[in-house]
């Protein structure tokens, strides 16, 4: 029997389930995006059309090629011998999907394809096949991807998920194929192997889950319920084979003793469900009745499966939030109290409702109901199911996903993240940087800074203005967390948060937590330890990236004095270029951190100096001279270890004079601070050669915040 390549499309997220389904039909396939591909006969393709609960469309793969202009497209389509696929007296229709780099207009692609096909038939037969968009004999599908065009001949036009039984439905209907997918994922096929399988949908709506479960229990081929289904009349079509396979499917139905029950509190919805059940012919298996989910009782003799897609998120969310949460809280109580040993699966896009169930999930899987992203949460009701304690991470996730439901203003924040990332990508590729600022209060209502550290995000919330409602500010902050997770595909546990004033530099170093968890990041040829949880800052200032490079370059094979050295990142860069470094800081914690940074870079820390001291006091007694000095003081400090309070605007003249006393006559002092209203002392400008290098030190990712720091290069006259 002749073999072909077929592509079977499905809803995004169920590809593996479809692959397994084809395996059960004796067909080996490969997982692709939004479908699977297999080599097989027309009979194999017919079996998928008849028996698949999950497939949307079955297509014969005709050809694939790279196409860069309209002439390429015409020649590619013309190179296919269309008379091998259908006769000139058969009508056809062209559908286009995907996106192509060079073709923005899908109507143009369709027209060019039609021209190539019609011209080929006309040149050979002096006749042309006609287009029929309503009831064609054949459907040709072009899928565009980057610069490639994939050509398929469809075996069916209407999606296989349409079963025709669902003539009465609610406001947010669940696709039949998705209902089947969550049943399979939840374990219904395994449940059917039991002596008496049991399935409950306690929020059944119009009954889609119940009906799909019954079809599987009775081994009813889905295509038998699709009254609109039409197999296309291509030259490969074998009507006798198709009719024989349909007859086998009809004769394969069986009687089942499965118990399938649905409940809902809405009588109008239950009436729709009952009519759909009769339409599907499964009224002998499925029963429905009115019941509040909070009154759910276990009247069964053995354990079973509960699968549901709650409609309450759409019906009640908003003014009736409290009732919504109470419904799910009561549902969780009923499960933990009366359904020991049962398995439960809940499909929802409203994560906060799951939290209210107070049950520990065993598995979470993402599915799509059309364009709507949903999650299937699975539970096993046992002694470990009930939550004893909500972790801070779980709480943050719950609040973030609930906040995202309260308004859609965070969509602008998400779009800005995407726009900024797209803008930075060429620069990031060129520099190889993995740590950078992605967003800095670009939208006033989302006053946060988003710093990317490879797979982690450091999210700083600027303290809200007193005129801003604190609840609104909190909601926006959690919406930002949600969109960072969703838009940037960052795990929630990798989003680390801080609340602070806008850019005060190293104004305070107090310890925030005590997790003591360090991560390694790369910056050019150096590696550094960062800590996202225990301190106000991470251990590296991303906005100082360029001045670190300037300092390191100037100090190559020379001596460097790093004052207010923090975690010694500038010293590491310089040491990697052969500099002999001296790092001075008041904090022994940060100096030890700095030593660890040296060791991380395979630099012998013993060959460098680390001095714990008040920098002003140390400079007053220092006798050594250095080629390069990096002076990066905090804006303000009142540490007990200091002899006096440091105010950078007031004290910078003293600091610079003391630092210059330790600088060789041909040396360079790099002076940096983060005080936005900083003004250089006229006496310093008069005494030394001072050049402002703010623009030189401003990295691509900080262009929107040009006043983030003041940088100066100072030399002797």
From Swiss-Prot:
<keyword id="KW-0808">Transferase</keyword>
<keyword id="KW-0694">RNA-binding</keyword>
<dbReference type="InterPro" id="IPR054170">
    <property type="entry name" value="RlmL_1st"/>
</dbReference>
<keyword id="KW-0963">Cytoplasm</keyword>
<dbReference type="InterPro" id="IPR019614">
    <property type="entry name" value="SAM-dep_methyl-trfase"/>
</dbReference>
<comment type="similarity">
    <text>Belongs to the methyltransferase superfamily. RlmKL family.</text>
</comment>
<dbReference type="GO" id="GO:0003723">
    <property type="term" value="F:RNA binding"/>
</dbReference>
<dbReference type="Pfam" id="PF02926">
    <property type="entry name" value="THUMP"/>
</dbReference>
<dbReference type="InterPro" id="IPR002052">
    <property type="entry name" value="DNA_methylase_N6_adenine_CS"/>
</dbReference>
<keyword id="KW-0489">Methyltransferase</keyword>
<dbReference type="InterPro" id="IPR000241">
    <property type="entry name" value="RlmKL-like_Mtase"/>
</dbReference>
<dbReference type="InterPro" id="IPR004114">
    <property type="entry name" value="THUMP_dom"/>
</dbReference>
<dbReference type="Pfam" id="PF10672">
    <property type="entry name" value="Methyltrans_SAM"/>
</dbReference>
<dbReference type="InterPro" id="IPR029063">
    <property type="entry name" value="SAM-dependent_MTases_sf"/>
</dbReference>
<dbReference type="GO" id="GO:0005737">
    <property type="term" value="C:cytoplasm"/>
</dbReference>
<protein>
    <recommendedName>
        <fullName>Ribosomal RNA large subunit methyltransferase K/L</fullName>
        <ecNumber>2.1.1.173</ecNumber>
        <ecNumber>2.1.1.264</ecNumber>
    </recommendedName>
</protein>
<dbReference type="GO" id="GO:0070043">
    <property type="term" value="F:rRNA (guanine-N7-)-methyltransferase activity"/>
</dbReference>
<keyword id="KW-0698">rRNA processing</keyword>
<keyword id="KW-0949">S-adenosyl-L-methionine</keyword>
<dbReference type="InterPro" id="IPR053943">
    <property type="entry name" value="RlmKL-like_Mtase_CS"/>
</dbReference>
<dbReference type="InterPro" id="IPR017244">
    <property type="entry name" value="23SrRNA_methyltr_KL"/>
</dbReference>
<dbReference type="Pfam" id="PF22020">
    <property type="entry name" value="RlmL_1st"/>
</dbReference>
<comment type="function">
    <text>Specifically methylates the guanine in position 2445 (m2G2445) and the guanine in position 2069 (m7G2069) of 23S rRNA.</text>
</comment>
<dbReference type="GO" id="GO:0052915">
    <property type="term" value="F:23S rRNA (guanine(2445)-N(2))-methyltransferase activity"/>
</dbReference>
<feature type="domain" description="THUMP">
    <location>
        <begin position="44"/>
        <end position="155"/>
    </location>
</feature>
<dbReference type="Pfam" id="PF01170">
    <property type="entry name" value="UPF0020"/>
</dbReference>
């Amino acid at each position: 029997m002749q073999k072909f390549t077929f592509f079977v499309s499905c809803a995004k997220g169920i590809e593996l389930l479809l692959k397994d389904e084809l395996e059960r039909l004796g067909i080996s396939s490969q997982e692709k995006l939004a479908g699977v591909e297999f080599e097989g006969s027309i009979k194999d393709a017919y079996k998928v059309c008849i028996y698949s609960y999950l497939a949307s469309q079955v297509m014969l793969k005709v050809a694939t090629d790279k196409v860069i202009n309209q002439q390429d497209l015409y020649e590619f389509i013309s190179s296919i011998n269309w008379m091998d696929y259908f006769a000139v007296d058969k009508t056809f229709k062209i559908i286009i999907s995907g996106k192509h780099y060079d073709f923005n207009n899908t109507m143009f692609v369709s027209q060019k394809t039609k021209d190539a096909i019609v011209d080929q038939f006309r040149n050979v037969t002096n006749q042309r096949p006609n287009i029929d968009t309503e009831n064609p004999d054949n459907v040709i599908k072009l899928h565009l991807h980057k610069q490639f065009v994939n050509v398929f001949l469809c075996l069916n036009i209407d999606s296989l998920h349409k079963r025709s039984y669902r003539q009465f439905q609610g406001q947010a209907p669940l696709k039949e194929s998705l209902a089947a997918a969550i049943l399979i994922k939840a374990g219904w096929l395994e449940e059917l192997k039991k002596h008496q399988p049991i399935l409950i949908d306690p929020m059944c709506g119009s009954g889609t889950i119940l009906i799909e479960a019954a079809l599987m229990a009775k081994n009813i081929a889905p295509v038998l319920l699709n009254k609109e289904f039409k197999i296309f009349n291509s030259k490969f079509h074998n009507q006798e084979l198709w009719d024989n396979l349909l007859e086998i499917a009809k004769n394969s139905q069986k009687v089942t003793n499965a118990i399938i029950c649905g409940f809902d509190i809405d009588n109008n919805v239950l009436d729709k469900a009952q009519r759909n059940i009769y339409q599907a012919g499964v009224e002998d298996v499925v029963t429905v009745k009115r019941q509040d989910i909070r009154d759910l009782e276990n009247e069964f003799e053995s354990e079973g499966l509960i699968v549901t897609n709650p409609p309450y998120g759409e019906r009640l969310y908003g003014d009736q939030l409290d009732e919504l949460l109470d419904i799910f809280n009561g549902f969780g109580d009923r499960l933990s109290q009366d359904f020991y040993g049962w398995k439960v699966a809940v499909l929802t896009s409203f994560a906060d409702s799951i939290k209210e169930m107070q049950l520990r999930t065993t598995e979470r899987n993402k599915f799509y109901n059309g364009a709507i992203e949903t999650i299937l949460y699975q539970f096993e009701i046992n002694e470990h199911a009930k939550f004893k304690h909500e972790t801070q991470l779980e709480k943050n996730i719950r609040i973030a996903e609930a906040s995202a439901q309260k308004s859609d203003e965070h969509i602008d924040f998400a779009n800005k993240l995407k726009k900024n990332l797209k803008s930075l990508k060429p620069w990031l590729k060129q520099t190889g940087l993995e740590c950078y600022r992605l967003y800095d209060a670009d939208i006033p209502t989302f006053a946060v800074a988003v710093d990317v550290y490879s797979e982690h995000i450091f999210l700083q919330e600027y303290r809200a203005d007193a005129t801003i409602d604190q609840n609104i500010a909190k909601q926006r902050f959690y919406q930002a967390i949600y969109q960072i997770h969703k838009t940037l595909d960052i795990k929630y546990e990798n989003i680390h948060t801080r609340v602070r004033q806008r850019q005060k530099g190293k104004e305070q170093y107090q310890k925030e937590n005590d997790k003591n968890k360090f991560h390694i990041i790369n910056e050019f040829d150096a590696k550094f330890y960062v800590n996202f949880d225990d301190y106000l800052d991470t251990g590296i200032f991303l906005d100082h990236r360029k001045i670190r490079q300037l300092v390191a370059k100037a100090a190559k094979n020379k001596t460097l004095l790093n004052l207010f050295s923090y975690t010694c990142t500038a010293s590491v860069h310089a040491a990697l270029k052969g500099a002999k470094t001296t790092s001075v800081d008041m904090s022994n914690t940060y100096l030890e951190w700095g030593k660890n940074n040296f060791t991380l870079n395979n630099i012998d820390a013993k060959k460098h100096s680390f001095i714990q001291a008040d920098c002003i006091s140390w400079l007053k007694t220092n006798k050594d001279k250095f080629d390069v000095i990096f002076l990066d003081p905090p804006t303000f400090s009142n540490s007990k270890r200091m002899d006096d309070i440091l105010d950078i605007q007031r004290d910078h003249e003293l600091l610079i004079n003391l630092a210059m006393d330790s600088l060789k006559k041909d040396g360079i002092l790099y002076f940096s601070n983060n005080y936005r209203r900083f003004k250089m002392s006229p006496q310093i400008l008069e005494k030394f050669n001072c050049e402002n290098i703010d623009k030189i030190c401003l990295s691509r990712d900080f262009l929107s915040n040009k006043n983030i720091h003041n940088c100066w290069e100072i030399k002797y006259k």
